[in-house]
């Protein structure tokens, strides 16, 4: 009930403002305080916005195109091109996306070596239906550093459910970029 009352109060003030608001600054400060990887914050409407921006940032920063991923990552062409729902997506887009298996560090290392020097990022959910085993996340971080690849944790599902700092706070592995949505706003349209 407290959340709903706060939501109605904010709806009366406005929700999509063209200039930075005090509320955005306040939330940004809280996020950078509690989330280990958060040095800056960019707001969006949903998890797809957050993961799209993260991949674009990684590609710009590294000047590389390939994406290695595991887990679910919404509706971007790079992700959907590797699924059975790929109708309407140019086939060549799938040439830049490569799935590895969660908890299988060898499958990730094989892809990093196969596309050496061309991988922009590793996009992954830090935890999903199974917990990380055998220092999996620590080894992913090591390989990302070794290959100079941006590590992105998609915490759209996990963020703020496990900890105020996301699952990264619990596991002690800090990604280069993080994506949050859903739980951050109790299902309302917001992502960071």
Report each predicted region and the residues it spans.
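Buried hydrophobic positions in well-ordered alpha/beta secondary-structure cores of metabolic enzymes
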Residues: 7, 31, 54, 67, ...
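PLP-dependent aspartate aminotransferase-fold enzymes
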Residues: 26-120
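Glycine-rich phosphate-binding segment of PLP-dependent enzymes
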Residues: 1-43
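Catalytic P-loop NTPase motifs of RecA-like helicase/translocase cores
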Residues: 130, 159-160
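Active-site PLP attachment segment
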Residues: 171-192
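Active-site nucleophile and cofactor-binding loops and adjacent substrate-binding regions
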Residues: 17-24, 42-48, 72, 157, ...
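Active-site core of PLP-dependent enzymes with the aminotransferase class I/II
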Residues: 124-150
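Conserved Walker B
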Residues: 127, 155-157
């Amino acid at each position: 009930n407290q959340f709903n009352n706060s939501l109605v109060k904010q709806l009366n003030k406005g929700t999509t403002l063209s200039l930075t608001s005090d509320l955005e600054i306040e939330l940004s400060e809280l996020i950078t305080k509690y989330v280990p990887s958060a040095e800056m914050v960019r707001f969006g409407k949903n998890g797809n916005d957050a993961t799209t921006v993260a991949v674009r940032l990684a590609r710009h920063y590294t000047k590389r195109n390939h994406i290695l991923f595991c887990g679910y990552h919404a509706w971007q062409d790079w992700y959907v091109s590797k699924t059975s729902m790929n109708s309407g997506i140019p086939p060549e887009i799938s040439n830049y996306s490569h799935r590895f298996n969660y908890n299988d560090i060898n499958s990730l290392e094989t892809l990093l070596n196969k596309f050496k020097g061309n991988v922009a990022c590793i996009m992954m959910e830090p935890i999903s239906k199974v917990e990380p085993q055998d220092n999996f996340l620590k080894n992913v971080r090591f390989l990302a550093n070794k290959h100079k690849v941006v590590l992105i944790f998609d915490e759209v599902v996990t963020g703020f459910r496990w900890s105020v700092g996301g699952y990264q706070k619990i596991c002690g592995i800090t990604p280069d970029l993080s994506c949050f949505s859903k739980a951050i706003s109790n299902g309302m349209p917001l992502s960071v």
